[in-house]
A protein has these predicted regions:
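HotDog/MaoC-like acyl-thioester-processing domains
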Residues: 4-10, 65-74, 81-118
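Short charge-dense sequence patches
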Residues: 23-30, 77-85
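Short Pro/Gly-enriched beta-strand edge/turn motifs at strand-loop
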Residues: 59, 76-77
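Hot-dog-fold acyl-thioester-processing enzymes
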Residues: 2-60, 114-118
Length: 118
């Protein structure tokens, strides 16, 4: 029954400043969106005192670019935790789909939890 908080969805709109010289969303923007949805998911499910006490940092990104979109396109990102945490580390997956449901970008990241005080 606890799987509900394991998944989180957010929509992004490709803005003019997100677009590269090829007319598509820049690769670095997808990484930024990964960090934005990860932060939103953490804030949505974590206790406030944990949000205040800890910060997550990325130690690894594995990214498959399968498609892309242009300016004004709406992209739906779904993030989920595929396994159990390993101590203060865990993997997070983020899948980005276009309006038609086509998988555009698939990301698997490793995150480490740090104490904000340190």
């Amino acid at each position: 029954g606890g799987a509900v908080s394991n998944s989180f969805t957010q929509t992004f709109i490709a803005r003019a400043e997100d677009i590269d010289e090829l007319g598509h969303v820049n690769n670095t923007v997808w990484v930024r969106w990964v960090q934005e949805i990860a932060t939103a998911h953490w804030r949505a499910v974590a206790a406030p005192e944990h949000v205040d006490a800890f910060v997550w940092v990325v130690t690894r990104h594995e990214i498959d670019y399968r498609g892309n979109v242009g300016e004004g396109a709406e992209v739906t990102a779904t993030t989920y935790i595929p396994g159990r945490p390993h101590g203060a580390r865990f993997d997070r997956c983020v899948d980005f789909h276009d309006a038609a449901g086509k998988l555009l970008v698939a990301v698997r990241s490793t995150w480490a939890m740090l104490d904000k005080a340190s």
